[in-house]
Amino acid sequence: AEVKVNEIKYIQKNKVFLLSLKRSKVETEEQDKKITSICKFEFVDRVKSKNIKQNDPEEKLELIGMDYLKNNDNYEINLMFTNNAYITLSTEIIEVTLDDQNKAD
């Protein structure tokens, strides 16, 4: 999925991390169609990133995977991008929703 740096938001006071992405709609027969979706992570206590130029809002990242691991009483959710870039979310509970917005193409 394609993500622009300026479409990644962490709202610390609400403990919400938002990611707007343009992705292939693989869950239907329209796999060649692109759709814009919002990926929302809730109950996020901390966010760390590496190899992402936050001062370049138009930089495009390619999300290639997500995984998580348990670290004591918390979880670390890893969002992995091409070029060895990643974002790590720390949370006590994993709660994620993916909401389709509209067709991109």
Regions found by a protein language model. Name each.
Residues 1-105:
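Surface-exposed, interaction-prone regions used to assemble/regulate multi-protein complexes
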